[in-house]
Amino acid sequence: MFPMVTGFMSYGQQTIRATRYIGQSFITTLSHTNRLPITIHYPYEKSITPERFRGRIHFEFDKCIACEVCVRVCPIDLPVVDWRFEKDIKRKQLLNYSIDFGVCIFCGNCVEYCPTSCLSMTEEYELSTYDRHELNYNQIALSRLPISIMEDYTIQTIRNSTKSKIDEDKSSNSRTITDY
């Protein structure tokens, strides 16, 4: 055949293929129109974390035996465990424990392999700071209990204000019957 005719045929095939791809993507876009929105208004609405969410690590100083298993199983050797050997009781005494959350990958190995369960993952995910050195948590900061999402003051006020609006709407729409 002539090269010009084959060129037009391949151009026509490419045009049909491109139209098919655009049509498929348009159908995909239209299939998402009936779904609920996923975006939340972050400071006022907080996402509910799943059951095994890996957030900030909680540390219980009294349970730790300074075995350093958490350091050995960590892929980046992150936890810093300072201890000294007490000769009179023949055991290690923990002096300091710290984790730098700026480097932590939240894999959960330290929590999973801890023999005394002194480490646990919390649902706390708000670790933003202006200085990366503030992400280095010592044992005091790690032992701080997490703030639950439902106990947050801003969330409670928003939830209560919407309930009061709903209650007002119900009371204005309902009739009251009084006995005389």
From Swiss-Prot:
Q: Would the keyword Secreted be found if you checked this record's keyword annotation?
A: no
Q: Sorted alphabetically, which PANTHER family does this protein's record hold?
A: NAD(P)H-QUINONE OXIDOREDUCTASE SUBUNIT I, CHLOROPLASTIC
Q: Where in the cell is it found?
A: Plastid, Chloroplast thylakoid membrane
Q: Quick check: keyword Metal-binding in the entry?
A: yes
Query: What note does UniProt attach to the cofactor annotation?
Result: Binds 2 [4Fe-4S] clusters per subunit.
GO process terms (BP): photosynthesis, light reaction
Which GO MF terms does the UniProt record name? 4 iron, 4 sulfur cluster binding; iron ion binding; NADH dehydrogenase (ubiquinone) activity; quinone binding
Q: What is the protein's name according to its record?
A: NAD(P)H-quinone oxidoreductase subunit I, chloroplastic
Keywords from the UniProt entry: 4Fe-4S, Chloroplast, Iron, Iron-sulfur, Membrane, Metal-binding, NAD, NADP, Plastid, Plastoquinone, Quinone, Repeat, Thylakoid, Translocase
Q: Which organism is it from?
A: Agrostis stolonifera
Q: Which GO terms describe its cellular component?
A: chloroplast thylakoid membrane
Q: Which cofactors?
A: [4Fe-4S] cluster
Which segments does the entry list as coiled coil?
none
- Its Enzyme Commission number? 7.1.1.-
> What is this enzyme's class at the first EC digit?
translocase
Instruction: Give the reactions, separated by semicolons, that this protein catalyses.
Output: a plastoquinone + NADH + (n+1) H(+)(in) = a plastoquinol + NAD(+) + n H(+)(out); a plastoquinone + NADPH + (n+1) H(+)(in) = a plastoquinol + NADP(+) + n H(+)(out)
Name the positions where [4Fe-4S] cluster 2 binds. Answer: C74, C104, C107, C110
Every 4Fe-4S ferredoxin-type domain range: 55-84, 95-124
Known SUPFAM superfamilies for this protein? 4Fe-4S ferredoxins (SSF54862)
Q: Could you say which protein family the record assigns here?
A: Belongs to the complex I 23 kDa subunit family.
Its placement in the membrane is given as: Peripheral membrane protein
Q: Which gene encodes it?
A: ndhI
Record: residues binding [4Fe-4S] cluster 1:
C64, C67, C70, C114
Subunit structure, per the record? Answer: NDH is composed of at least 16 different subunits, 5 of which are encoded in the nucleus.
Q: Describe the task this protein carries out.
A: NDH shuttles electrons from NAD(P)H:plastoquinone, via FMN and iron-sulfur (Fe-S) centers, to quinones in the photosynthetic chain and possibly in a chloroplast respiratory chain. The immediate electron acceptor for the enzyme in this species is believed to be plastoquinone. Couples the redox reaction to proton translocation, and thus conserves the redox energy in a proton gradient.
